[in-house]
A protein has these predicted regions:
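Secondary-structure boundary motif
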Residues: 12, 17, 48-52, 118, ...
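Structural alpha/beta surface segment adjacent to cysteine/selenocysteine redox centers
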Residues: 37-138
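C-terminal cap of thioredoxin/glutaredoxin-like
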Residues: 28, 32, 39-48, 133-220
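Bacterial Sec-dependent N-terminal signal peptides
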Residues: 1-21
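Generic anion/oxyanion-binding catalytic loop in active/binding sites
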Residues: 9, 22, 98-101, 137, ...
Length: 220
């Protein structure tokens, strides 16, 4: 299924990595998106199975600048989390459910990944998964730079440089650019996967898919 139009194509060509010679897997998600957490092992398998493909993460922005608390969204999230546990077998820590001081703003987590990608592009998916773990397993404060600096340190990044970049207007702008790119691609839900091949963009997944199914779609 192609999602390309001339207008979108011309706009997207400003992103140099979309002009790569090799086919490209584009994963669009948000580290605090429930089904993106469930999808993490599947997209990892896809990446590992297609070493001849370029791989890029685009941050979609689930609830940037969100103001609702985990108490506000607790029942809704708990329902989805139980579905994800049943479908994937992944563990989830429910400790944050019902916390009226925990604000569900996904922009800082997305920005944390954008900065890590700038400093060390090859870790972007692993860093994405580490941010997911901070939320879904460790119940870390996802608006605190300390959370992301700790992750950066584990990846061997210069934490002083990371903190400076994380708090910069450039990082905020680059994060918004990812959100805008996802919108330009026509993405309205996460996780989504787009394949770029021969200058065409094809929607391979809009929502959770097993890696086996996704690989079949990509190979067709």
């Amino acid at each position: 299924m192609t999602i390309k139009s001339t207008l979108i194509f011309l706009s997207l060509m400003s992103y140099s990595w979309l002009q790569a010679q090799n086919p490209t897997i584009i994963y669009i998600g948000d580290p605090m998106c429930s089904w993106c957490y469930g999808f993490a092992p599947e997209i990892t398998k896809v990446k590992e199975a297609l070493p001849d493909h370029e791989f890029k993460v685009v941050l979609g922005g689930l609830r940037p600048q969100g103001t609702e608390t985990m108490a506000d969204l607790g029942d809704f999230l708990e329902h989805h989390w139980k579905e994800i546990e049943k479908r994937t077998g992944l563990p989830i820590n429910y400790g944050s459910i019902g916390d009226d001081s925990f604000i569900l703003d996904t922009e800082p987590g997305c920005r944390a990944i954008v900065v890590a990608r700038e400093m060390k592009p090859e870790i972007e998916l692993d860093f994405f998964k580490a941010v997911q773990r901070a939320f879904y397993i460790d119940n870390k404060d996802m608006r605190s730079e300390k959370t992301f600096i700790e992750i950066a340190d584990k990846f061997g990044l210069d934490t002083s440089a990371y903190a400076q970049k994380f708090n910069s207007e450039e990082a905020r702008y680059n994060t918004r650019s990812d959100f805008h790119l996802a919108a330009e691609m026509g993405i309205k839900g996460f996780p989504s996967v787009i394949v770029r091949h021969n200058s065409q963009l094809y929607l391979a997944a809009n929502g959770f898919r097993d890696a086996e199914d996704l690989l079949k779609i990509i190979s067709d």
